[in-house]
Amino acid sequence: MKFHLPLPGRRLRRILTLLGQAALCCVLTAARLGGLYAPFSLAAAAAAGPGLPGLLSLLGVTGGALLFLDFQPGLRHAAAAVLLFAAQTAFCDTKLYRRPAFRPLTAALSQLLIQSVYLLYRPLSQWVLCLTASALLAAATALLTAHGTSPRQKGLLYAAALSLALVPVTVEGLFSVGKALLMAELLLLSRRLPPLTAGLAGACAGLAADLVPETPALLLTVAYGC
């Protein structure tokens, strides 16, 4: 016997899905790199696309910027999200939007355009951090918007990004909770990805974990990529 979900139930599920996407974008802002960038919340907003899902994701990113970032970095982060949403809305009906590289490049360029004004008279290390965060943003967006990425894989990617927020949390100063979770999630993800893709995902995760502290040190990039 088949049961059909009534229309109010479908609407409720749709509303909950949209609110969940907005909440995810908000919480992902806690995964900060260098205390200045939150590329994975922008990647989730880029994956949401234009229209109502994109608008609610924009609100989620803005809320996360207020909660988890200082005022100036949060303002730039929210501005990048606005620019990203505007670009996706402007091109959503074109052939260009359907190209696999469009959303990853648009997300990275939105962040770079906003941040570059602030970085004009900053040291080279700040530029390197911004470029690295933008590269991670493009990579995460590409994985989330790829046609071959299953919902389970996307869930593991989101879980790995959320684990970055727990990297500073340690148990009796012995090990990082976020790093332990990140390694476990990468092991699960590597079983469902080709070896090269799994290695790249591990390297990106290690690089992101290295950049979480305000004084980054590249220690885990190679380890997680192996």
Residue spans for each PLM region:
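Membrane-embedded alpha-helical hairpins and interfacial helices in multi-pass inner-membrane proteins
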Residues: K2-C226
